[in-house]
UniProtKB/Swiss-Prot annotation:
Subunit structure: Has been crystallized as a homohexamer with an acidic central pore with a diameter of 26 Angstroms on one side and 14 Angstroms on the other. In solution has been shown to be a pentamer.
Gene that this sequence comes from: eutN
All residue ranges annotated as the BMV domain in the record: 1-83
Gene3D superfamilies assigned to the protein according to its UniProt record, in alphabetical order: EutN/Ccml
Protein name: Bacterial microcompartment shell vertex protein EutN
PROSITE patterns in the cross-refs: BMV
Pathway where this protein functions: Amine and polyamine degradation; ethanolamine degradation
Function: Probably forms vertices in the bacterial microcompartment (BMC) dedicated to ethanolamine degradation. It may be involved in transporting positively charged molecules into and out of the BMC.
UniProt keyword annotation of NAD present: no
Swiss-Prot/TrEMBL GO biological process terms: DNA damage response; ethanolamine catabolic process; protein hexamerization
Protein source organism: Escherichia coli (strain K12)
Length: 95
């Protein structure tokens, strides 16, 4: 699993049928201190995350399982919206 911050939404009206009508989000990965690390990606989201929110992601076959379709071309899927992150006894993020 990975942590990321949602930086935007992608509108794609023509897409593979395996993606249905799920929302596509632009996300930036977060390092252990909670800072964006510059790695951007597109994740499928069917739980309703919004811009600026921290999210928990899964990739590969786990993303396809989370999307409930082993045959869809999904490589990154939002599985949670983060409320709080504590690392080393310190709160590094609180919604």
């Amino acid at each position: 699993m990975k942590l990321a911050v949602v930086t935007g939404q992608i509108v794609c009206t023509v897409r593979h049928h395996g993606l249905a009508h799920d929302k596509l989000l632009m996300v930036e990965m977060i390092d252990p201190q909670g800072n964006p690390d510059g790695q951007c990606a597109v994740a499928i989201d069917n739980i309703g995350a919004g811009t600026g929110e921290w999210v928990l992601l899964v990739s590969g076959s786990s993303a396809r399982q989370a999307h409930k379709s082993e045959t869809s071309p999904v490589d990154l899927c939002v599985i949670g919206i983060v409320d709080e992150v504590v690392s080393g006894g310190q709160v590094i993020f609180h919604k």
